[in-house]
Design a protein with these regions (language model features):
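A solvent-exposed interaction/effector surface
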Residues: 4-176
Length: 176
């Protein structure tokens, strides 16, 4: 199976979350902890995607194929690119294959609250800035404080042209 076939499926497992507040394209969500694979590098996002894709395609200690999931997390910070794949919920830190590539970190994320704004099309820096501003304005209006940097997530294969789903997200201080 080629890369395009593996990332063109619409039947991916999606990371679980609970919607706390929903208003138009804005949501506050609670995300329970999940297992993730992360690459931090000064390479472009395509290089990071390739490393993570190779890991789930069998470049790991068990030579095991791991199913693709959604979303893919992406952040640019101080000339570094960070990309994370969520691992299928059937895996634990103890059961998942270890990457052969030392630049890939497998970790268990903490349960947290996030605010997001959803948008369509292909994401780019202009759309990220526009929707980031919109998200920060909405959080300010609701008097909700942020924690950490903004980042974006993508739910679709690059080969999907229509009805794409992207989101700008940020961790928030929230008590349910």
């Amino acid at each position: 199976m080629c890369i395009r076939d593996r990332i063109n499926s619409s039947s991916y497992e999606t990371q679980k979350y609970e919607i706390i507040i929903s208003e138009d394209d804005f949501e506050i969500r609670f995300y329970p902890s999940s297992l993730k694979a992360k690459v931090v590098s000064d390479r472009n996002a395509n290089g990071n995607f390739y490393k993570l894709f190779q890991f789930i395609s069998g470049n790991n200690t068990k030579g095991e194929k791991i199913e693709m999931t959604t979303p893919v997390y992406m952040k640019e910070n101080d000339n570094l690119n960070i990309m994370e794949f969520v691992m299928p919920s059937s895996y634990t830190l103890g059961s998942i294959s270890k990457p052969n590539d030392d630049s890939i970190e497998i970790y268990e994320s903490e349960a947290k609250y996030f605010a997001c704004i959803r948008y369509g099309g292909y994401s780019n820096s202009g759309k990220f800035k526009t929707h980031s501003k919109k998200l920060i304005e909405k959080l300010s209006e609701l008097n909700i404080k942020t924690k950490g940097d903004l980042f974006y997530v993508s739910y679709n294969s690059p080969y999907k042209v229509f009805n794409r789903r992207n989101e700008v997200m940020v961790e928030v201080e929230y008590e349910d």
